[in-house]
Amino acid sequence: MSTTIDIPESSKVVKGKGVVAAPLRPGGWKKGVAIMDFILRLGAIAAALGAAATMGTSDQTLPFFTQFFQFEASYDSFTTFQFFVITMALVGGYLVLSLPFSVVAIIRPHAVGPRLFLIILDTVFLTLATASAASAAAVVYLAHNGDQDTNWLAICNQFGDFCAQTSSAVVSSFVAVVVFVLLIVMSALAMGKP
């Protein structure tokens, strides 16, 4: 005589009501913020390096010149524009180097360390980019309008291509500044809420 024990299957298996997926962790929106952070960083890289490249290649020589005088406008004629090119290149370099930290924030959206590190450095480079963009904007304004009180004449009437390139570079740098502000606000909100 053999004894067998029949064990009935669980009611969940028979009826097909098992757990399909694990419940979502609260704060799953932080991963979305981290992905948006990465995308905005890519846009800021394009804006900052585009501004540096546009300003760095701004150069125009007037078609009329004499044996002794040649009229040329170039970014390296203005120390403010030199500062602009260097700082925008530094900002672009920082943004490239910050991409791995942004990826870590995507993989581990609840980690506070990478976000705090990015907020601190983003704030430092925001001030650098803002100072650079504002000083270049002041010089571009003088190039377009001049200053009657100091007898500075507007040069954009003669150097139109040069002024168009420098103006484009300044606009691009302010786009990078706005993206930095968005990055800082998004990271602060993601750190603040559970």
Swiss-Prot record:
Membrane-topology descriptor: Multi-pass membrane protein
GO BP annotations, alphabetical order: cell wall organization
Role this protein plays: Regulates membrane-cell wall junctions and localized cell wall deposition. Required for establishment of the Casparian strip membrane domain (CSD) and the subsequent formation of Casparian strips, a cell wall modification of the root endodermis that determines an apoplastic barrier between the intraorganismal apoplasm and the extraorganismal apoplasm and prevents lateral diffusion.
Cytoplasmic topological intervals: 1-32, 104-115, 190-194
Subunit structure, interactors included: Homodimer and heterodimers.
Residues spanning the membrane: 33-53, 83-103, 116-136, 169-189
GO cellular component terms attached to this protein's record: plasma membrane
Keyword terms, alphabetized: Cell membrane, Cell wall biogenesis/degradation, Membrane, Transmembrane, Transmembrane helix
Cellular compartment(s): Cell membrane
InterPro entries per UniProt: CASP/CASPL, CASP_dom, CASPL
All ranges on the Extracellular side of the membrane: 54-82, 137-168
Full protein name: Casparian strip membrane protein 2
Highest taxon above the source species: Eukaryota
Pfam families membership: CASP_dom
Family label: Belongs to the Casparian strip membrane proteins (CASP) family.
Covalent S-S links between cysteines: none
Primary subcellular site in the record, as a coarse category: membrane
Species of the source: Vigna unguiculata
